[in-house]
Amino acid sequence: SAYGTSVVETSLKSRKVMEYELLDYETTGDMANFTGEQAFTRALVGLFTEDEQHVYFVTGHGERDLAENYWQVKSLLDGEGYVTRAVNLATTGRVPEEAAILVIAGPRKDFTKEEIYAIEAYLDEGGNVAALLDPLGQADDLPNLKEMLRNQGIGVNDDLVIDPGSHYFLDMAGVIPKTRSHLITERLVTKDLSTFLPRSRSLYRIDDGEKDWESSSISVEPLLETTDEAWGETDFASEATFDPKIDMPGPLTLAYVVKHELGSSQARLLVVGNASFLDNDIVTFQGNIDFFMNSVGWMTGKKDSISIRPKTPSYEQVYLSDRQAKSVFYSTVMVIPAAFALLGVGVWVRRRNL
């Protein structure tokens, strides 16, 4: 083989790992992440897997872009042997047959009824869907998409979740939810890893009496929940304060999984009231990427991939809310210098009076 190329092979197939696949440089060019583990894993999966599993990300409604917003997610999916693709349902008219999962990541515009029919047909055939929804204000109302999720057992609230009981620093809309027990989350719980969901909307389970389905054919389980102190803010024009007349009281659910029995097959869904938790600058927070990748493994039946992944080196950044930034500014630029100035004046006066 060519210099710098590794080859893994069996008696029937072979896969090459190129030198450029072993390192992934940041856009600054200053730091390289070692991606050899993912590259060799991808090669081995290709050797021993008959059919590659494709993960399709929906486009056409202002969703997150794989190359720009979700490149770290794409890298992890590629590294674990998945094939990532984009699909515009308005042009294809259907979900591709080879799709193992269809990801709807933060749509800003609603789906047409024809697109909804295509997704429902995919689910009826035992497909898997991950719907990640931003709160109202970051996206338009999504009546068609919400109705489709409602038919699968999940209701979507038009609110912004505020949680004084568990949040990131001083940002009460940056929720760090409690993790419920499930195959997807059990290792997160064991390792005491949290997830961080900045600016979320709440979800709820549709009662069986509201829809005509057999309760035994569908199961809906919560994964992420707020504390009892949380509420779903519905008045976006004023400061966030709980109003029992219009706001949703806590605890609130931020993520569900749905399993729908379809005779010889199953449809599986992940619904999260947040799409930002997979953004490039947030996905490295503790358990965020593991939560999503474990969900992918659960939906595709790859139980061996449900684990805690090694972290790649990264620049540590501090994210400050407006209140935090003002606090840092006043303390470092005004309070501390003023304190030293007063101390100096006091020493000078004391020495002068001696």
Task: Annotate each PLM feature.
Residues 1-354:
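Short, surface-exposed patches at the edges or C-terminal ends of soluble domains, predominantly
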